[in-house]
Amino acid sequence: MNSLYSVVNTLRDRYAPVSHTSTFRQTGEITPEEFVAAGDYLVFKFPTWSWGDADSESRRASHLPPGKQFLVTRNVPCNRRLNENFAGDAGLEEAVVDDGDEFKGSKGDDDGWLRTGGLSSSQPLKAREVRTVDDAGNAGERAQPDDDDDIPDMEDEEDDEAIIRDTDASGQTSSRRTYTLYIMYSPYYRTPRLYLSGYGANGQPLPPHNMMEDIMGDYKDKTVTLEDFPFFANNIKMASVHPCKHAPVMKTLLDRADAALKLRREKLKTGDASGQQAGLEGLADEFNKLGVSGKGDASKIDKNDEWEDIQHDDVADQEVAIRVDQYLVVFLKFIASVTPGIEHDFTMGV
């Protein structure tokens, strides 16, 4: 079934009509030319990213120039698995976020995104509600949380030599992994699409089912599929984040940024400008509030939240908060919510 799905997706992109009309502000979609411009910006700003070419001319996408068929970054660290211990109880409360007006896809897809993580409404009370029970079944007083001063310091404890294990490299199985990330352009959805190829601590490629260990919650069943990367001849299975919801989510982020920029301009005119930090760093809170990031619902985003301008240029000279050539920087911030164990910021730290 997965192989058939992969073939269908490949044929969709191969035979879908390519639009060269920009609808970036209206739909969150981009044209091939805008994808190249955004890729050039990403490579210029963050040199860990580079352009890649197809293995053969027959595998090239005609709507993209040779040598700029896809973007790639290698050796991205991933040091922890997304098991039940990754986020404590936070990963146990999940809900499917259906398409609303802001997230309704343009291709007729009827599946939503999974919202996972975040404390439940009763979570902060759990520690205070614990009571002791005697042999007769009578409930005692509520247990009081331990004082930090009463917790013994681990450095004061002596190691028992009998339990020290030999950590010889030949017998040790490390949890460290690295990933190669690829970004291609999908003509059918008119958005970028991310592919991931993982490697174990020994440098050997990860089996496809092992890569799914680094995908958050039910995304692995609903949003992420195993597919062949269309530019490579030797059909290597990679994990791919399906782009059916990319455009509406990106449009929501762009609209929020523009609204915040407008508010900032008004404050500048009245001499009441906020001193908050400018730049992409301010995007983190907004992603945490989106349903796709696992921290909340887009409908609950405070429309008065301030997004700062992505550049440090004079605000009065800016028409929009995020330009089309900066699209992929925001896209990667958004897509990191699907694979939080993979250190995406590592690729943008140069």
UniProtKB/Swiss-Prot annotation:
Example of a GO cellular component annotation carried by this entry: phagophore assembly site
Biased composition (Acidic residues): 146-161
Annotated GO biological process: autophagosome assembly; autophagy of mitochondrion; glycophagy; piecemeal microautophagy of the nucleus; protein targeting to membrane; protein transport
One Pfam family per UniProt: Autophagy_act_C
Chief subcellular location: other
UniProt keyword list: Acetylation, Autophagy, Cytoplasm, Germination, Protein transport, Stress response, Transport, Ubl conjugation pathway, Virulence
Sites bearing N6-acetyllysine, chain numbering: 262, 267
Annotated region (Disordered), positions in chain: 97-171
Keyword Nucleotide-binding listed: no
Extent of Basic and acidic residues compositional bias: 102-113
Positions annotated as active site in the UniProt record: 244
InterPro entries: Atg3/Atg10
Keyword Cytoplasm attributed: yes
Gene Ontology molecular functions: Atg8-family ligase activity
Region described as Flexible region: spans on this chain: 85-166
Role summary: E2 conjugating enzyme required for the cytoplasm to vacuole transport (Cvt) and autophagy. Required for selective autophagic degradation of the nucleus (nucleophagy) as well as for mitophagy which contributes to regulate mitochondrial quantity and quality by eliminating the mitochondria to a basal level to fulfill cellular energy requirements and preventing excess ROS production. Responsible for the E2-like covalent binding of phosphatidylethanolamine to the C-terminal Gly of ATG8.
PANTHER family: UBIQUITIN-LIKE-CONJUGATING ENZYME ATG3 (PTHR12866:SF2)
Protein family (similarity comment): Belongs to the ATG3 family.
UniProt-recorded name of the protein: Autophagy-related protein 3
Gene, per the UniProt record: ATG3
